[in-house]
Amino acid sequence: MSMLCYTLIIAFLIGIWAAPKSEDNVSLGSPATPDISDTSCAKTHEALKTSQNTDQHSPAPKKAEDQEFGSAANIIVDPKLFQKRRFQSPRVLFSTQPPPLSRDEQSVEFLDNADSLNRNIRAKRGIHPVHNQGEFSVCDSVNVWVANKTTATDIKGNEVTVMVNVKP
């Protein structure tokens, strides 16, 4: 089982490593495609030079952490990542609202539609007695266990003899 797990993890890592890089998930240091214009690279290079020049004129000492994360300000985040999406599935209906906690605390929206009541509220099942307990054991008619009984009535109503010792 562990060998299968290791194999799947290695296959996953190889797949990620061999996947082609797109412009969306590429780090700043490695371009994804060779058609990136030199002007954009030159602009970022000039911006870095000017920021370094302004930093050199300031008398405040810089920490090593600030120098490492100085280029992190140029990261652009796609606004599509933060949009709320409604999930769709052919088999499951995803609701945009949480189900009500109890019948008394239901909101007016759920009470307006009878279909939503049927879909969201479940009826509790009644507790059924278990009928098959001890069906292979010997039991007297008054439900008292006896050890010295030699005959019994089976499920179909036939008289059967009870074996005292069972050989394995």
UniProtKB/Swiss-Prot annotation:
Expressed by the venom gland. It comes from the Eukaryota. Residues 1-18 form the signal peptide. Residues 19-123 form a propeptide. One of its GO terms (molecular function) is peptidase inhibitor activity. The keyword Glycoprotein applies. Keywords: Cleavage on pair of basic residues, Disulfide bond, Glycoprotein, Growth factor, Metalloenzyme inhibitor, Metalloprotease inhibitor, Protease inhibitor, Secreted, Signal, Toxin. Residues 48-70 are annotated as: Disordered. The keyword Secreted applies. GO terms for biological process: cell surface receptor protein tyrosine kinase signaling pathway; modulation of chemical synaptic transmission; negative regulation of neuron apoptotic process; nerve development; nerve growth factor signaling pathway; neuron projection morphogenesis. It is found in: Secreted. Glycans are attached at residues 25, 148. GO terms for cellular component: axon; dendrite; extracellular space; synaptic vesicle. PROSITE patterns: NGF_2 (PS50270). Nerve growth factor is important for the development and maintenance of the sympathetic and sensory nervous systems. It stimulates division and differentiation of sympathetic and embryonic sensory neurons as well as basal forebrain cholinergic neurons in the brain. Its relevance in the snake venom is not clear. However, it has been shown to inhibit metalloproteinase-dependent proteolysis of platelet glycoprotein Ib alpha, suggesting a metalloproteinase inhibition to prevent metalloprotease autodigestion and/or protection against prey proteases. Homodimer; non-covalently linked. Belongs to the NGF-beta family. On reduced SDS-PAGE, the determined MW of this protein is 18.5 kDa. This is Venom nerve growth factor. It comes from Echis ocellatus.
